[in-house]
């Protein structure tokens, strides 16, 4: 082992550890330059460069040359406002840790990132605890990314282009100001871990049920009142965190119900009574309308609906240990009671109607995984 000042180089592990030494960019620059040509071989063999918790305000220029095989760079806990073009010279970099800095805005990442070799090499990127208000577009071109962490920023939304990251296995977006989840998030076939906690999310798109590899889903501390019934398709899900959400126990009884239009009533009659028709009998718009019918999920009903329906929360057993509030759409208010009664395996509808809302909620919430 060779020690130069307080920095430690471990020859066997090809690692330079300069953590928590309160060094500035200038000091680091001087040290790297001082190593010079006599230690060129050691620099070229370096695989890991650890610089967290110092006083760096920019990346040292020396990174732009002499580190061709560097695989891990940790610059977390500094005062970086931008990652300069020196980063693009690290052609084999696999892991970049730059959390808890001051990164944000369009100039935070180097120009040409999406066209650089990093697009093919970088697998782990941690930018949590910075000042990003939106996901930088260049990040969405890093096709080799397996782990992306952007927690604790100021993100307002998730771009639809997130689906470009087809190799992504872990996505951490907790602690932001996200209100909506784009349906395109469901197009990530390799995603195992999805963290969306501590945001302002009000609903979950049913397309998330396409994440067939998902094992852990963190949704705690949001504004969710229900989950889509399609979430039951996540058969590999092992962890589900829902604490801190206003998940409802009963649907609001006095929810305004708008009666069906005459067009919908006529279309319902055609569907329910199996009245035959051909493409030559009706205009194209009516044919398309009739084709948009949805079946009422109440097994005792057998009806259909088009634009007008009644929403109802139904608690459903999931994986044998969770009771999840899922949204159902019924064709009329008359379908509410039978369907609701069938959905409660441990508490009858009459009991639920007679109990105080708060006490029902408290007991039900104990049956939902709280994380």
Swiss-Prot record:
Region called Disordered, residue ranges: 340-361
Carries keyword DNA damage?
A: no
The LRR repeats are at 45-66, 69-91, 92-113, 121-143, 144-166, 167-189, 190-211, 213-234, 236-256
One annotated GO biological process:
intracellular signal transduction
Indicate, by first and last residue, each region the UniProt record lists as having compositional bias (Low complexity): 340-351
Q: Which UniProt keywords apply?
A: Leucine-rich repeat, Phosphoprotein, Repeat
- Gene3D superfamilies (alphabetical): Ribonuclease Inhibitor
SUPFAM superfamilies named in the record = L domain-like
| Phosphoserine modified-residue sites | 24
Q: Which InterPro entries match?
A: Leu-rich_rpt, Leu-rich_rpt_typical-subtyp, LRR-SigEffector_domain, LRR_dom_sf
rRNA-binding recorded as keyword: no
Q: What is this protein called?
A: Leucine-rich repeat-containing protein 58
Organism listed in the record = Homo sapiens (Human)
């Amino acid at each position: 082992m060779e020690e130069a000042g307080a920095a430690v180089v471990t020859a066997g592990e090809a690692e330079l550890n300069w953590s928590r030494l309160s060094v500035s960019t200038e000091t680091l620059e001087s040290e790297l330059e001082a190593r010079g040509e006599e230690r060129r071989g050691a620099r070229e063999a370096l695989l890991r460069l650890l610089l967290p918790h110092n006083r760096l305000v920019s990346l040292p220029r020396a990174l732009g040359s002499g580190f061709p095989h560097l695989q891990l760079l940790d610059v977390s806990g500094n005062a970086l406002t931008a990652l300069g073009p020196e980063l693009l010279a690290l052609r084999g970099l696999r892991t970049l840790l730059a959390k808890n800095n001051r990164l944000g805005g369009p100039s935070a990442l180097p120009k040409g990132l999406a066209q650089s070799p990093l697009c093919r090499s970088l697998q782990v990127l941690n930018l949590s605890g910075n000042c990003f208000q939106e996901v930088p577009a260049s990040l969405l071109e890093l096709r080799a990314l397996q782990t992306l962490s952007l927690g604790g920023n100021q993100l307002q939304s998730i771009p639809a282009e997130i689906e470009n990251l087809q190799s992504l296995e872990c996505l951490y977006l907790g602690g932001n100001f996200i209100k909506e989840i784009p349906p395109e998030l469901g197009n990530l076939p390799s995603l195992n871990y999805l963290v969306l906690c501590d945001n302002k999310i009000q609903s979950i798109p049913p397309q998330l049920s396409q994440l067939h590899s998902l094992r852990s889903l963190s949704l705690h501390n949001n504004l969710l009142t229900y989950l889509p019934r399609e979430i039951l398709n996540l058969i590999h899900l092992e962890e589900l965190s829902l604490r801190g959400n206003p998940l409802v126990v009963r649907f609001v009884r006095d929810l305004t119900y708008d009666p069906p239009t005459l067009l919908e009533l006529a279309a319902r009659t055609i569907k329910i009574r199996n009245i035959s028709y051909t493409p030559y009998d009706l205009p194209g718009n009516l044919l398309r309308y009739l084709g948009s019918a949805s079946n009422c999920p109440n097994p005792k009903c057998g009806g259909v609906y088009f634009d007008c329906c009644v929403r109802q929360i139904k608690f459903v057993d999931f994986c044998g240990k969770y009771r999840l509030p899922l949204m159902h759409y019924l064709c009329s208010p008359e379908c509410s009671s039978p369907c609701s009664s069938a959905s409660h395996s441990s508490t009858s509808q009459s009991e639920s109607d007679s109990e105080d809302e708060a006490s029902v909620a408290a007991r039900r919430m104990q049956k939902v995984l709280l994380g």
